[in-house]
């Protein structure tokens, strides 16, 4: 089922900072500048993240003067829902319009253990992975922290209708998260904070294609967030073909950074490995992958790829997927095959946005 909403006009000239970009201490600092007590920050966050109001007038325990100051300083309406697709398995894909007319995707996935959301960090992507729809059209801009936070808020509002909640999230949507590092970290801290969305750090996962300097930086952060690497190949030659970023950040150097992260944090790392028919899915690839990961505290997530019309890759046959998994297991690698969701909608990352861009150019 698909629901489509009319687009809003661009409103670039009147753009104010999003209130969802502010961490609690930043809100306290702003209140101090306004001559307001800092305990109001907790009240404001309660309205934003617990009651999830859509306008300042609903913040009834704040004075009209403070509500006016908030309205004059910060946008509270960040996203406009353009399209909402619901899969037969309960997966929901949202296409949101931003203030400047660009669109982004967010996906809600339902699991036995709860509801997970996949968020976007950029409008487009500059990494150029040859199998990904997100890179079509290149990178337009980074999202502000508040635009990432607002994705979770909007999806949670949709879940409020059925008294459900977002229990976990993955930063695996459109864009390279580490290419927007500061806004990513602001988002994670707001999302994790008890006064914010209060999603536990161990229920959040950040994925990167392998920007090595940011991996070292991420290892020093004081957040116990799960970490994943988009690997997709067991050697440099094949990875450079699939992921041009490997030409800048070589696989041996990436593995050194990963080992540093694991040793520094003590946390297990996840390797995402998309299976592309005839490209990286043979037994010899599995054997090479097992050798590459030997001694690394890790888990491999095998991903049967979604078909993207603009790309030439095909799905690996089911029996070959199981053989690849068995080859890894026989060599002591912790591995699972990712459950497919949203297969009957535009579920691959960037597909719905690419479809929307095509409509715009007609």
From Swiss-Prot:
SUPFAM superfamilies: Radical SAM enzymes. PROSITE patterns: RADICAL_SAM (PS51918). GO terms for molecular function: 4 iron, 4 sulfur cluster binding; metal ion binding; rRNA (adenine(2503)-C2-)-methyltransferase activity; rRNA binding; tRNA (adenine(37)-C2)-methyltransferase activity; tRNA binding. Residues 111-344 form the Radical SAM core domain. Gene3D superfamilies: 1.10.150.530, Aldolase class I (3.20.20.70). Binds 1 [4Fe-4S] cluster. The cluster is coordinated with 3 cysteines and an exchangeable S-adenosyl-L-methionine. Pfam families: Radical_SAM, RlmN_N. GO terms for biological process: rRNA base methylation; tRNA methylation. NCBIfam families: rRNA_mod_RlmN. Specifically methylates position 2 of adenine 2503 in 23S rRNA and position 2 of adenine 37 in tRNAs. It is found in: Cytoplasm. The keyword Acetylation does not apply. Disulfide bonds join 118-349. Reaction proceeds by a ping-pong mechanism involving intermediate methylation of a conserved cysteine residue. Belongs to the radical SAM superfamily. RlmN family. The active site is at 105 (proton acceptor), 349 (s-methylcysteine intermediate). Its EC number is 2.1.1.192. It comes from Bacillus cereus (strain G9842). S-adenosyl-L-methionine binds at residues 175-176, 207, 230-232, 306. GO terms for cellular component: cytoplasm. This is Probable dual-specificity RNA methyltransferase RlmN.
């Amino acid at each position: 089922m698909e629901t489509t909403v009319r687009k809003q006009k661009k409103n670039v000239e009147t753009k104010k900072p999003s209130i969802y970009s502010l961490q609690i201490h930043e809100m306290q600092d702003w209140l101090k500048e306004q001559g307001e007590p800092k305990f109001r920050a907790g009240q404001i966050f309660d309205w934003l993240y617990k009651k999830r109001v859509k306008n300042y007038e609903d913040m009834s325990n704040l004075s009209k003067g403070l509500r006016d100051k908030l309205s004059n300083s910060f946008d509270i309406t960040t996203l406009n829902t353009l399209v909402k697709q619901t899969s037969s398995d309960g997966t929901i894909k949202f296409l949101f319009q931003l203030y400047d007319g660009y669109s982004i995707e967010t996906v809600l996935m339902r699991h036995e253990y709860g509801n997970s959301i996949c968020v976007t960090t950029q409008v487009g992507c500059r990494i150029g992975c040859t199998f990904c729809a997100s890179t079509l059209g290149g990178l337009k801009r980074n999202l502000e922290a508040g635009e990432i936070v607002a994705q979770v808020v909007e999806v949670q509002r949709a879940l409020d209708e059925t008294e459900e909640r977002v229990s976990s999230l993955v930063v695996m949507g459109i864009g390279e998260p580490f290419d927007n590092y500061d806004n990513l970290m602001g988002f994670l801290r707001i999302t994790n904070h008890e006064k914010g969305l209060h999603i536990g750090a161990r229920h959040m996962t950040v994925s990167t294609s392998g920007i090595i300097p940011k991996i070292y930086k991420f290892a020093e952060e004081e957040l116990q967030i799960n970490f994943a690497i988009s690997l997709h190949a067991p050697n440099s030659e094949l990875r450079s073909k699939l992921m041009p970023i490997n030409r800048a950040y070589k696989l041996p150097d990436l593995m050194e950074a990963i080992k540093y992260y694991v040793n520094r944090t003590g946390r297990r790392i996840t390797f995402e490995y998309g299976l592309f028919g005839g490209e990286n899915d043979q037994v010899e690839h599995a054997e090479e992958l097992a050798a590459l990961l030997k001694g690394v505290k890790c888990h491999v997530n095998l991903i049967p790829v979604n078909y993207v019309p603009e790309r030439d890759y095909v799905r690996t046959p089911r029996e070959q997927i199981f053989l690849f998994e068995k080859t890894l297991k026989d060599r002591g690698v912790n591995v699972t095959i990712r459950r497919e969701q949203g297969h009957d909608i535009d579920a691959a990352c960037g597909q719905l946005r690419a479809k929307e861009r095509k409509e715009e150019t007609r």
